């Protein structure tokens, strides 16, 4: 996977010589630029030096949007949950994010100091990749997202990340990725033995200040102590 070309990205360091990394994937039609603006809103403690990496998804035709070419982590073929995601595209994006993880490892960051985060489509990739990654990660954050292909998780999940901290947050009025889908994803994870920090907000398919601060608290907790692995 390390031979995969790295996606273009925006990086934001919160301090000198960051010893932790957060790889944060945007949603459909967006770029890493939009989410890079949230870093100051997270409220991270000054002593925590983190590199945030915001990759730009490749552009591709998106079926549900009449084939319009836009940044996407995978094709969306239908509006319903079961046939929504192009699993081959999800797998391809997993490979790309594994390459981003490898790049952070190559600069000396332990896997246990790396968090995968994402919004909507990006959250799908964060969950799909993080739960299958071979080394223990610091955490996974999924905002306004869902678990794709949950039936494969029991066989494909990495033993190293069976206890990885997970934060999921969702809007109660989300018209794009329905709240019930997120609840089903949380239930599937908890049934599989994962502990999920769950937040629900009175909003649609968007982010809120309270949600971003909850993410900041989660990152502060899972990255608080240096790990050796």
Describe every region a protein language model picked out.
Residues 180-229:
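C-terminal catalytic histidine-bearing segment of alpha/beta-hydrolase fold enzymes
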């Amino acid at each position: 996977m390390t031979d995969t070309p790295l996606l273009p990205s925006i990086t934001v360091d919160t301090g000198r010589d960051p010893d932790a990394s957060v790889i944060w994937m945007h949603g459909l039609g967006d770029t890493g630029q939009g989410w890079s603006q949230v870093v100051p809103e997270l409220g991270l403690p000054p002593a925590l030096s983190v590199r945030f990496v915001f990759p730009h998804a490749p552009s591709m035709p998106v079926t549900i949007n009449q084939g319009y070419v836009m940044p996407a982590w995978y094709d969306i073929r239908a509006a319903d949950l079961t046939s929504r995601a192009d699993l081959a595209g999800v797998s391809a994006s997993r490979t790309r994010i594994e390459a981003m993880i490898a790049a952070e490892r190559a600069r000396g960051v332990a896997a246990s100091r790396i968090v995968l985060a994402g919004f909507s489509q990006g959250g799908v990739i964060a969950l799909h990749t993080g739960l299958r990654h071979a080394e223990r990660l610091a955490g996974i954050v999924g905002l306004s997202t869902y678990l794709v292909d949950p039936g494969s998780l029991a066989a494909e999940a990495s033993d190293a990340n069976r206890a990885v901290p997970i934060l999921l947050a969702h809007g109660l009025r989300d018209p794009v990725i329905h709240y019930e889908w997120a609840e089903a994803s949380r239930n599937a994870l908890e049934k599989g033995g994962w502990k999920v920090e769950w937040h629900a907000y009175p909003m649609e398919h968007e982010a809120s200040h309270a949600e971003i601060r909850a993410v900041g608290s989660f990152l502060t907790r899972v990255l608080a102590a240096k790990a050796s692995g």
